[in-house]
Amino acid sequence: MDNDNPLLQKAADFYRGLRFTMKYRGVDILPAAAGNDLARDLLESGQPFLFGRCGATEMRTVADWLQNGGHNFTDRTRADIRNLSGVFPTDDATLDKFCRLYVKTAQSAELLALWNVGAEREVIRGCDATRFTELRALEPYYHARPWSAALAGKRVLVVHPFRRTILAQYEKRTQLFPGKNVLPEFASLTVIQAVQGLGGQDTGYASWFDALTEMERRMDAADYDVAIVGAGAYSLPLAAHARDTGHAAIQMSGATQLLFGIKGKRWDDHPVISKLYNPAWVRPDETEGISNKEKVEGGSYW
């Protein structure tokens, strides 16, 4: 969370940057602008690829998994991975299976944005051909030549819980980022409603893996060139599934809603994002909430 005192925020940012530099010393990390440029080049090439990032709660769960040999996850870890990322049930067998899948998927990415969360540093030691970049490379509105401009004329699939709002906002795309080529006109837009298990919400599925399989099935039935994914802990595996079935995939995770001009509490006071807000931006449709949204970082996406 950003500090209200600008000097304290500046000091915190400096310290965070210093820790990142020391911890990732020796890792070749592209600056955010260069990562954005590479993503745009990959999109223009038409080749399958995965550009994503590791989730914070997911990487803390992986840290527990690495430390305890796949069992004895802490109560805090079980609660957070359920409420903040939507993984269920949270027994040892499920979390062990989840961590194995998540690590394997992260290590297979063509481009991975790093931001020093949980076991991320340990996980990337297993990357063979992955290129790394700074986190803001994933968010196109930060850049003069946004990677998202390369979505023009492409068949785009979005996997996200806010299906209704995204479809409505896309129709207002020219109003969302005036003067910037952030959200161009696609050849087509398909939105798959992501399963929402955040905050302990009942999903109607027996397990996280059952829900994952169903969303993969829906993706396979869609006609698309590029997938943009923001679906909690499902995001990285779903993006990898898109890549593995011959598509380009970018895992924007929580920031996906910003691409479509959808406000969220976590950005209301953000020094950059809040200034992008304009009268065309909206909150998620009231039908797209969850019963316990306050459990999700205080309702940060609504």
Describe the residue ranges of each PLM region.
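Electropositive, gly/pro-rich neighborhoods at or near active sites that engage anionic ligands
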Residues: 2-185
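Mobile, glycine- and charge-enriched loop segments
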Residues: 148, 155-204, 277-279, 283-302
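C-terminal functional extensions of proteins
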Residues: 237-302
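A short, acidic, amphipathic alpha-helical segment used as a generic capping/interface helix at domain edges
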Residues: 34-38, 95-101, 210-223, 234
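Glycine-rich anion-binding loop/nest that anchors nucleotide
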Residues: 160, 224-239, 251-253
